[in-house]
Amino acid sequence: MRSARIAELLRPFLSGSCHSESGRRPGETCPERSRREPAVLSATQLDRISTYIDLLIRWNSRINLTAIRDREEIITRHFGESLFAARHLFPEEDSPQRHTRVGHDFSRANAGSRQSGALAPEVRIRLADLGSGAGFPGIPIKLWASDIALTLIESNHKKAAFLREVVRSLTLTNVDIQNKRAEAINQTYEVVTLRAVEHFGDALRVAARLTTPSGRLALLIGSSQLDDAQSTLPGVAWQPPVPVPQSQSRILLVGTVVPTM
């Protein structure tokens, strides 16, 4: 598929965070940054998305990665939703690669190391994608914010093999694939994402455990799951849900894990 068509299909998902009125509290105003025109993906990002789609369709004939077969629907349903979450989690300033870790100015701290081509590991944001499956939203988030350290948690061996092939083919660095159940993970992460998992309540509790205190938990879920999420994790400071573009029922729900005393 041509890069121009991919960019066109993804444009609605890369608009400013506040374009949807229903995602804001009464009286809340949009930051000036969020009123800008939709972000523009680079040629490299678009090429990687195209390669990813080809891999997904080829592997999907052998293992069940997605029920969606149409390329354009794959772009809007999988990549669009994932990049929508990416822009909310890591809103761009001068470029998609500049973002701030909790309590730490990432762009300034790494100014010298960026010039040398190395990144200080102590300031790299760690993001875990729980139940990663075909890699959504974790890998598209990595394509958007390449400086993060990404962990893909997937217990299914065949799906984990697919994830390794995607990471290799896209030449992604600082990506760790954990082929095990999330309950067996002892590491914690600044950001944990969750999308389309079984046993939703149990997965939520595991995701919260994997999130560092003051870290963020990001859920791409159906609106019917909103009450379950909020009641299952009442200790999370949830932001108002944000509707996903071009969907009647999908939402992005982001919350901060409140430190316990």
Predicted regions span which residues?
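Short glycine-aspartate micro-motif
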Residues: 127-129, 150
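Class I SAM-dependent methyltransferase "Motif I" SAM/SAH-binding loop
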Residues: 131-135
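Class I SAM-dependent transferase core
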Residues: 1-16, 39-93, 128, 158-159, ...
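Generic detector of short, well-ordered, non-transmembrane alpha-helical segments enriched
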Residues: 26-27, 32-34, 52, 188, ...
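S-adenosylmethionine
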Residues: 36, 136-138, 143-261
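Intrinsic disorder/low-complexity segments
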Residues: 1-46, 90-126, 258-261
